[in-house]
Each structure stands twice: as C-alpha cells, then as structure tokens.
C-alpha cells in the first residue's frame, strides 16, 4: 500500500515515516510538511494518508484526501466534535473511503487513558494533567 505522511517533519510524523519505511508491505509515497503541495498525494497514487499536522489545517487536508478517494488516519490533536461532524458529512459523499481518528498515538497518552480507567474504580474524583514536550504545537 502507498502511504503518505502529512506533518512528516514533526515528532510523530518522523516516527510514522520510519515505521512505513521499515514495513515490507508499505511504500512511503510522500512525506509532506508545511508548505508542500497536497497534489503530490494524487501524483504518487497515495492510497492512505496519515495526518500529524495541526488542528487548523487538518480539515483542509482531509477534504483533499477524501475528495480524491484516499483513506485517512488522523493523529492530529484537537479533533473536536465540530470537525467530526464535518468529516462524517464529507464521508457520506464518499462511501468507499475510510477514516480513523486517533488523536493520541503517543505511549504516554495511551497509558494515561488506561490509568484513568483503573483509577476511576477506586476514587470518587481525580484529576489527570497531560503535559507535552516543550515544542508541542
């Protein structure tokens, strides 16, 4: 499968590019970042886009991909209910295109969710504070 990464120079994008390059059944079709043209997705025959960009640009990226029948995986944080509603509307016109929204690919975020489920069984109330690296957008 031909997979492109948007936000390829960021922390998670860099990891995604490395994982795709290491997989025998995947081909990196494009590694795009801020300022790069999305046209490269169609020019390279991309089948799946993994988006690790920014909440302000993710919908434009998804619209381009879905309108070009490219499946999408979104790892961008800040994907709220409004964006989810927009995505559902967009996908309703493209029934053969799939989308996966997983805004927390980081191990720490996954562990935090697991810890919170466990803690909820034992505490009446608790607060969990999530922190990011210093350069997180």
Task: List each model region and its residues.
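Extreme N-terminal starter segment of soluble prokaryotic enzymes
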Residues: 1-3
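Hydrophobic beta-strand scaffold residues
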Residues: 28, 72-73, 98-101
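Rossmann-fold NAD(P) dinucleotide-binding segment
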Residues: 48, 56-75, 84
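Rossmann-fold NAD(P)-binding glycine/threonine-rich loop
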Residues: 63, 76-99, 114-118
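N-terminal Rossmann NAD(P)H-binding glycine-rich loop of SDR-like oxidoreductase domains
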Residues: 6-9, 13-17
């Amino acid at each position: 499968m031909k997979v492109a990464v948007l936000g390829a120079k960021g922390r998670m994008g860099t990891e995604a590019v490395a994982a795709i390059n290491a997989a025998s059944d995947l081909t990196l079709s494009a590694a795009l970042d801020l300022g790069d043209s999305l046209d490269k997705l169609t020019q390279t025959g991309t089948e799946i886009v993994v988006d690790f960009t920014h909440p302000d640009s993710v919908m434009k990226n998804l619209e381009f991909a879905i309108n070009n029948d490219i499946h999408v995986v979104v790892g961008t944080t800040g994907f709220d209910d409004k964006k989810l509603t927009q995505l559902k509307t967009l996908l309703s016109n493209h029934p053969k295109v799939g989308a996966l929204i997983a805004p927390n690919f980081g191990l720490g975020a996954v562990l935090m969710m697991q810890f919170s489920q466990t803690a909820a069984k034992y505490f009446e109330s608790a607060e969990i504070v999530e922190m990011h690296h210093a350069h997180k957008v």
